[in-house]
């Protein structure tokens, strides 16, 4: 298949999230786990971006002047707080319903996010480039992981960063992130994740390296029931985040 004919879109996944679009901003709804996950991933994004671009993480707008793409932004749970850090944010999602919810919420909250119902390949074909590409909890929902990652990588400017967060394809992840989270604890609707679509770290690192991005940080993330919060961890067997950089 020619690259022009390839698509990153898995329509069944788009339809699944479109059907839940109205619940994006409910902290007790179907996206409750992402609301809980937001503080740790936002801190990770801010701290590494500030280290890379020479910013003060304690400033009110540490990402001022940086252009950021939140690919697969959903309802904008990540786009809005990143925009409040001063970044110029493009929130992209193939679901018109998700973008509608995100745009309405941003207008009400005053968050300056440029939301677009587009795919990664459409942005890349248009020549869009960014200082930071946020690829968070998306790769396990696309049709072609390698093509999706290389497409996103092409939009990272020299000296820029790409963050990737997802779930590892391990039996431990199958037990905790799928069986327990979806069937026992009911944190997520059944069918949110399929084991065969989970992605191992090396399956992310290889296509990024092929497009000139170097992995500069890796971390696991785990949920502590006692603290009722997510924390960084050395254990990458379930949830994990990778940070890649293009040489400047």
Swiss-Prot record:
CDD domains to which the protein is assigned, alphabetical: AdoMet_MTases
Record keywords, A-Z: Methyltransferase, S-adenosyl-L-methionine, Transferase, Ubiquinone biosynthesis
Organism: Rhizobium rhizogenes (strain K84 / ATCC BAA-868)
Pathway assignment: Cofactor biosynthesis; ubiquinone biosynthesis
Example GO BP: methylation
Family: Belongs to the methyltransferase superfamily. UbiG/COQ3 family.
Reaction equation(s) it catalyzes: a 3-demethylubiquinol + S-adenosyl-L-methionine = a ubiquinol + S-adenosyl-L-homocysteine + H(+); a 3-(all-trans-polyprenyl)benzene-1,2-diol + S-adenosyl-L-methionine = a 2-methoxy-6-(all-trans-polyprenyl)phenol + S-adenosyl-L-homocysteine + H(+)
InterPro entries listed in its UniProt record: Methyltransf_11 (IPR013216), SAM-dependent_MTases_sf (IPR029063), UbiG_MeTrfase (IPR010233)
Function: O-methyltransferase that catalyzes the 2 O-methylation steps in the ubiquinone biosynthetic pathway.
Sites where the protein binds S-adenosyl-L-methionine: 41, 72, 93, 136
A GO MF term: 3-demethylubiquinol 3-O-methyltransferase activity
Enzymatic class: transferase
Known EC number: 2.1.1.222, 2.1.1.64
Pfam families hit by this protein: Methyltransf_11
Protein known as: Ubiquinone biosynthesis O-methyltransferase
